[in-house]
């Protein structure tokens, strides 16, 4: 007999859980931390006037926290543009070729900016400053390179303005993103509102991907030691056209309850 499963991402791996255990998928709203709880519990949210515990699957599966991933990305793009500016200055002072991109869509930051949108006003305010400054940085770089062929001295003067004004503005906004890495990560992740044994909870995931129909006979069992976790029991693995998907058999809600968490029975 076939069952419907929803596939979702946690880090580089895909997992699936039975659709009949999932109530809905929500963006992450304000999370209230709970002191002295197991670290796999991110906190609670108010869902239909009930408090639901949020289970951090990245922590459970020993995957780097998403806010740390975003902080690393923003630190990398800050370094990228520092290197870009230094290389540009050297190419001007030594009158040699500049080999890095002047296309603001092509760099690491540009690709991320093109793919990201937000309803968070604080992050949106940063992006309203960052997007035009970043675009101007690369475009002005190309303009200076074009001018250098006719007037090297004017190009060098423009380089000073590029560095002291436009780059500083870009760098300032990137630093703000680094400081807001946690907020950005919450904008990118989702919550699966789930129910098991009449107890409701939320799974924090990187994103939902697909619904698949699975015959139970297609699930390949896992070794007991690799499929066991204090909170999550893995049933096995299935192979899709894209990759392997780990099937979650159950969430250990009894263990959750034993930790004095605010689990909710809404039956």
Predicted regions and their residues:
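The feature marks the first
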Residues: 1-39, 61
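Positively charged
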Residues: 9-10, 20, 193-206
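Short, structured motif recognition centered on aromatic/hydrophobic residues
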Residues: 15-17, 51-57, 202-203, 243-248
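Flexible, small-/acidic-enriched active-site or ligand-binding loops
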Residues: 24-41, 206-240
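Compact, glycine-rich, soluble single-domain proteins
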Residues: 41-44, 58, 193
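Extended intrinsically disordered, low-complexity coil regions enriched in Ser, Thr, Gly, Ala
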Residues: 60-68, 102, 150, 186-187, ...
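N-terminal membrane-sensor/transducer module of prokaryotic signaling receptors
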Residues: 64-188
């Amino acid at each position: 007999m076939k069952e419907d499963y929803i596939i979702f991402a946690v880090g580089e791996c895909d997992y699936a859980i039975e659709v009949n255990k999932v109530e809905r998928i929500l963006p992450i709203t304000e999370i209230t931390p709970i002191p002295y709880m197991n670290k796999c519990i991110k906190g609670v949210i108010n869902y239909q006037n009930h408090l639901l515990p949020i289970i951090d699957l990245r922590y459970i599966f020993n995957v780097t926290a998403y806010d740390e991933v975003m902080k690393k990305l923003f630190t990398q793009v800050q370094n990228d543009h520092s290197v870009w500016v230094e290389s540009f200055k050297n190419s001007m002072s030594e009158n040699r070729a500049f080999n890095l991109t002047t296309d603001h869509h092509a760099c690491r930051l540009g690709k991320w900016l093109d793919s990201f949108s937000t309803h968070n006003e604080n992050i949106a305010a940063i992006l309203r400053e960052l997007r035009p400054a970043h675009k101007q940085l690369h475009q002005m770089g190309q303009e200076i390179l074009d001018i250098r062929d006719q007037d090297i001295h004017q190009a060098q003067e423009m380089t000073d303005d590029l560095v002291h004004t436009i780059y500083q503005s870009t760098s300032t906004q990137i630093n703000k993103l680094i400081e807001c890495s946690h907020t950005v990560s919450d904008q990118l992740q989702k919550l699966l509102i789930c129910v098991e044994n009449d107890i409701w909870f939320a799974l924090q995931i990187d994103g939902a991907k697909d619904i698949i129909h699975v015959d139970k006979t297609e699930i390949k069992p896992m070794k007991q030691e690799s499929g066991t976790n204090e909170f999550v029991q893995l049933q096995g693995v299935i192979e899709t056209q894209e990759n392997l998907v780990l099937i979650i058999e159950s969430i250990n809600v009894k263990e959750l309850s034993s930790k004095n968490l605010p689990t909710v029975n809404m039956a």
